[in-house]
Amino acid sequence: MAVISKKIPAPDKVEIKTALLSVFDKTGIVELAQALSEQGVRLLSTGGTYKAIAAAGLAVTDVSEITGFPEIMDGRVKTLHPTVHGGLLAIRDDSEHQEAMKTHGIEAIDLAVINLYPFEDVRAAGGDYPTTVENIDIGGPAMIRASAKNHAYVTILTDPNDYAEFTEQLSADGGKTAYAFRQRMAAKAYARTAAYDAVISNWFAEALSIDTPRHRVIGGALKEEMRYGENPHQKAAFYVTGEKRPGVSTAALLQGKQLSYNNINDTDAAYELVAEFLPEKEPACAIIKHANPCGVATGSSLVEAYRRALACDSVSAFGGIIALNRTLDAETAEEIVKLFTEVIIAPDVTEEAKAIIARKPNLRLLSAGGLPDPRAAGLTAKTVSGGLLVQSRDNGMVEDLELKVVTKRAPTAQELDDMKFAFKIGKHVKSNAVVYAKDGQTAGIGAGQMSRVDSARIAALKAEEAAKALGLAVPMTHGSAVASEAFLPFADGLLSMIAAGATAVIQPGGSMRDQEVIDAADEHGIAMVFTGMRHFRH
């Protein structure tokens, strides 16, 4: 049976007479304490916060003086006391609560300013197990939750960004806060503790290799509110989880306006793809539109990689996202600004390149500070009606697979390189995906079709259009390798690929009709390998 409320009406304005300040992040805390002192508010504090306030010459009382109990166990126990929690939780207009406060010498606390041990930062920095556990805050969340529950009477501040609004209200209302403000701060407080606990629970699951915990909570901190979502009638916001994986959520915006919902989604897809190519081995460029690649290439230089990626489908690249695996240089920047582009993301940007990009002030330029590790473990999540689908990140790499030649003809060394290149790209194309590649360059990409044959045909059509635009006698699919991200269920898909000019095929295998497909390949002298790994993407 649920706990029954006494339904005592909450007052609109509550005067702040006593405040408890206990923070790890001391940004603005002395200034806040000064403002409270000027309003005649009694200050209570703990540990380092107490020292900072006292050092500023402000009158402050250590919490241990009102509890009559010292801080013990290396600070693990300092505010977990009835005097503190009674002062936060007491319903001021309840006679029974008032009597209990008098009986036990409990004073009301009207304001709590609390923030937490930096568990997220310690986890992100890869702290060892004991250090990470030690940075799990106990007293802080308890006080936050107690204060937020009793927001009818208590104001809770958990974010230094709210101090200015609070002090303005305090000055304007004669040292009082409004109920609407207290409600809003309470909602924010519970969101903060929920996100904090989510990070802790997910860290434990990761540390203990628990793949399917009984409860899975994914938390995030608001990074920005957006003008709209995927479409103008949808509301949207961008939340960051605290994971330090280089990419769109951690990158610095060097120029350009705020990224849109679609910009963020597409930029993430682009950067995750280009990270498949080691920068120390070769420069690479990926051009993305609607989260699908329209051109990917490597080259002897970054500018050559860009030109080759653009050549695959220069029409679709218009208004796209460009991702690079090396520092953006001036020569590449000069080429990029010739085309209307939404976003460029790279590990770094030279000063010369910045000056060139600045000629296009609406072009968003992101410096990610590094590349994400495509082999790193992690989670992805997708919402469905009433649920959340959570899975491990697709970190399978074709270089790590044992490829099985299943045809009479084995691929040449060049065909094998092209196969691996195409399969890398196919991993990042919406299913059904077919990718033709030749000499480290996509020749044609077919994405998102219900029929794999249609994806193969679209990819071939794109190659034909590119050949016309470039003045080539034949499409680049002639003599190419082709990748399918999932098995070929029938020989018709293979025959379509052969008709486009492919000489080698890479696919996961695993169809009931694998032998039928193999026989068709042998009949046409095609080399085919199985990877044993599928890369569906939806």
UniProtKB/Swiss-Prot annotation:
User: Pfam families from the entry?
Assistant: AICARFT_IMPCHas, MGS
Which one GO biological process term can you cite for this protein?
'de novo' IMP biosynthetic process
Q: Which GO terms describe its cellular component?
A: cytosol
Q: Where is the signal peptide?
A: none
Q: Reaction catalysed?
A: (6R)-10-formyltetrahydrofolate + 5-amino-1-(5-phospho-beta-D-ribosyl)imidazole-4-carboxamide = 5-formamido-1-(5-phospho-D-ribosyl)imidazole-4-carboxamide + (6S)-5,6,7,8-tetrahydrofolate; IMP + H2O = 5-formamido-1-(5-phospho-D-ribosyl)imidazole-4-carboxamide
Q: What is the disulfide pattern of this chain?
A: none
Q: Which InterPro entries match?
A: AICAR_Tfase_dup_dom_sf, Cytidine_deaminase-like, MGS-like_dom, MGS-like_dom_sf, PurH-like
Organism's domain of life?
Bacteria
Q: Provide the E.C. number(s) assigned to this enzyme.
A: 2.1.2.3, 3.5.4.10
User: What is a single molecular function from GO for this protein?
Assistant: IMP cyclohydrolase activity
Q: In which pathway does it act?
A: Purine metabolism; IMP biosynthesis via de novo pathway; 5-formamido-1-(5-phospho-D-ribosyl)imidazole-4-carboxamide from 5-amino-1-(5-phospho-D-ribosyl)imidazole-4-carboxamide (10-formyl THF route): step 1/1; Purine metabolism; IMP biosynthesis via de novo pathway; IMP from 5-formamido-1-(5-phospho-D-ribosyl)imidazole-4-carboxamide: step 1/1
Where in the numbering of this chain does the MGS-like domain appear?
8-158
Keywords tagged on the record: Hydrolase, Multifunctional enzyme, Purine biosynthesis, Transferase
Identify the HAMAP family for this entry: PurH (MF_00139)
* Similarity remark: Belongs to the PurH family.
User: What does the domain comment read?
Assistant: The IMP cyclohydrolase activity resides in the N-terminal region.
State what protein this is by name. Bifunctional purine biosynthesis protein PurH
Q: Which organism is it from?
A: Rhizobium leguminosarum bv. trifolii (strain WSM2304)
- Organism classification: Bacteria, Pseudomonadati, Pseudomonadota, Alphaproteobacteria, Hyphomicrobiales
User: What gene is this protein translated from?
Assistant: purH
